[in-house]
Amino acid sequence: MKKNLLSAAVAATSVVVASSAVGQAYINDRLTGEALVYPIYSAQNGNDTYIHVVNTTGDYKAVKVRMIEGENSQEVLDFNLYMSPKDHFAFAITADGEGAKLKTTDNSCTVPIIPSAGTTADGKTIREVS
C-alpha cells in the first residue's frame, strides 16, 4: 500500500472483558459473553467503523480494548476501559490526515485517557502501512 493510504483495511479488534468470574469465554443464551473478536475495522474510502461496548450486568467491569493491524498483526492501539453497571461506551474509527483516528465523546474512564479530539498513532494513533 502507498504511505498515504490508511491502514486498517483488514484488521482485528478484540475487546476482552476481565472479570472475576470464570477465566473461560463462552456465549450464553442471552448472546452475551466474556470476549468480542471483531474481524475488521476500516476508515478507507469515506467509511468509519463504529463500535459499542455495553456492560449488561449490575457489576463494575474492567475491559481491555486492543486494535491489531491486518497487514502484519502489530498492535496499533490499546487501552483499558472501566465501566460502571449498565454502562455503555461508544467510539468510532475514522479517517485522519495521517491514517486513522479513534474518536469518542463518551466520558467513561479510559487509561490512557482518550482526549475529545481523538487519539492517533505516535502517542496512540492508528498507524498507516508503508
Question: What does each model-found stretch correspond to?
Answer:
Residues 2-10, 19-130:
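Gly/Pro-rich, tryptophan- and cysteine-flecked surface segments typical
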Residues 15-16:
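Surface-exposed, well-ordered secondary-structure segments
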